[in-house]
Amino acid sequence: MNPSSLAEAFERHLKLDLMLPSAKAGDRDRFEALTAAVRDLIGERWLATDAAYDLKRPKRVYYLSMEYLLGRSLKTHLACLRIEPQVREMLERRGIDLDRLLETEPDAGLGNGGLGRLAACFLDSLATLQIPTIGYGLHYEYGMFRQEIADGWQVEHPNNWLRRPDPWEIARHKEAVEAKIHCALRFEEGGTHLSDHRVTSLRGIPYDRPVVGFGGKTVNTLRLWEATSPDYFDLNEFNHGDFFGAVHDKILAENLTRVLYPDDATSAGRHLRFLQEYFLVACSLADIIRHFRRTGGEWTSLADQVAIQLNDTHPAMAVAELMRILLDGARLGWDESWELTVRTLAYTNHTLLPEALERWPVELFELALPRQIEIIYEINRRFLAEVHARFPRDEVRIERMSLIEEQPVKAVRMTNLAIVGSHSTNGVSAIHSELLRTRTLKDFAQMLPERFHNQTNGVTPRRWLLTANPGLADLLTQAIGEGWITDLRKLRVLEPLAEDAGFRARFREVKHAAKVRFSAWLKSALGETVDPGSLFDFQVKRIHEYKRQLLNILHILILYDRLRREGAGADGPARTFFFAGKAAPAYALAKLIIKLINNVADVIDADPAVRGRLKVLFLPNYDVSLAERLLPASEVSEQISTAGYEASGTSNMKFMMNGALTVGTRDGATIEMAQEAGEENFFLFGLTAEQVLGSRGWYDPHWHYAHEPEARAALDLIAGNHFSRGEPGVFAPILDALLTHGDYYMHLADLASYTRAQTEVAELYLDQDAWTRRAVRNVVLSGKFSSDRAVTGYAEQIWGVRPCPPADADLAAGRSGESADHRMSARTGP
């Protein structure tokens, strides 16, 4: 697109879509007009991509995920289309600042954490690699909550990201599908509940979003389902004065896609989550099968044309639902239906936490999905017969492997269902996959070893380096050209530049400029003043005990105590510790940890003894846009989970790409990162996964309290209400978790080792040349952790799919709006 045509499209959309002259348009109006102009360009390539897929009929990937943490789209699309300079120039001629327009776009409220961000990275890579793909998810009205901090506490507010319609979405009402549940929805005691009143039809309306591959050659689709009722309005109820009853069914149906992860502390929340998962599966499979049959697919070729990836256990009901479609809809026999189901489905496990391995009460299935539970029972009967034949007289093993858990509540084990009903189960880091095979899923790995694989996670360098850190991206491109953008391993040739004093100096300039820029944003957005010359240390991720934000804060208390005792003579650099992340609304201890972090920050800020040497900040409402701001400024990345509990992690990879040095345990993908860059370029500490497991029977946190003076001093500061700020005893549950209840996540066991690692960090930081050598090596040796590498592994080893690039003829058809079906009929005749 040349600048003149782009300018014409921008002005046209501003005037004709929004009915505004340029002089009266605000930033949001201009953002919408610019988005529409860019979408015009994307639309041609989107149609061309669909035309190529329809004509060539390649095997397609269908990615099912409850969440997609997309962030903002305009900046990424401009980068992928390679038109940001032209757009910026066009706007500057009109006195418009592109960066201001970019700031008006809200982060899409479609995800929460690593699971959703991984899904978004994978979609980016699938489009860049030109692999035919449709992502399926739910169209949340509010998504995850918006986090505010009040008096140190997390407060949840609705995230009304759709206050104004999202210009990237296209509602496809003609493509709507119906999902039936064998119960009614009713409103009772403030929530949505199920009752065995009647069969209820739910209508799923798809909202399509473009997924633009780098270079803009392929544009795949993310299809999100919004729930509503087929009967929007009951006129009879309205005419009788029951105005709520007139829209009762519509409101209850729409609640299904109102928020991401309803609070499961209540029965209403659990019912809603259960129906959300089924709604995603039912709508997506109906759409997949409709497309498969529409393009002439025979049932026997389903697995040759369709690869369905289950992103965690949330879509695991796909096993029973696909069997229902094949048995009841296609009228196939059991054996053929089962073979097709297993060959079509693949499952990614994302956790080692027992509480995160989903289970749904059988009574919910019996109430809402009676046919599906019949099928699950039959799958279980046949599978357990195979287990019994393989391991006779091992009744305990049979009970563990059953799809049905009998106690304490009869429930369907969704992980077991996903494993048995899929041809592939993969972990997301080498250690995670090994622990799945040897611990968590050991029985299944012994029974079905050929189904277990590893695919270490990755992140897209387009968003997390090219667009998030343009200064560093330019430095890399000046050195080796742009090839690294689509093949991150090419950065490896830059490793010798770690010894080049000139390159190190330019690298430091880029980092310092990013720190100054981030500091300025903190001042303007949050009113916080930080020293850009201090060491910037980040722990940004979901707040959870196993991720050990508490370990980080305990070290900060040790550092605080040292600085108070040693005064002006204390060694080491000034340090700023940043925290960010959300706690689940029902997770009381995680919310208390947020309170502790904020109270510690306030006390340190007010203490003149450490002013200018130590600062702590909690950044509220962590999201993709905030991550993009802070990553370029990062110098230390905290990856300090209890070993054996982090499946992979992806923030660790983003920090590595941006030149931060990792302080970490030997857990998740951090192990592989250290192998790639060399352990000498990391600050590794703490117990290994084997040591954590081996210490369960004898570990005593009181020993560390008694024998480690600095640990005792830190805990005594908390116990002595030094940080309670008028609420004596407020942090007693944290002390109880550490000392009374056994310190399950081994904070005190690792505290001394962690403190030594942090001392090494401080000492190295004083030698900026040595620090920069390590930082450069981290960046240039991060190539393995591109999501392009991960997706290629899935494509070759699990899905059996190949790229399908659109041809020039397809792009021409996209420009003309000619359909693929029309071109096919013209070539092949009636």
Which residues are covered by each model-predicted region?
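A conserved ligand/cofactor-binding region detector
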Residues: 1-818, 824
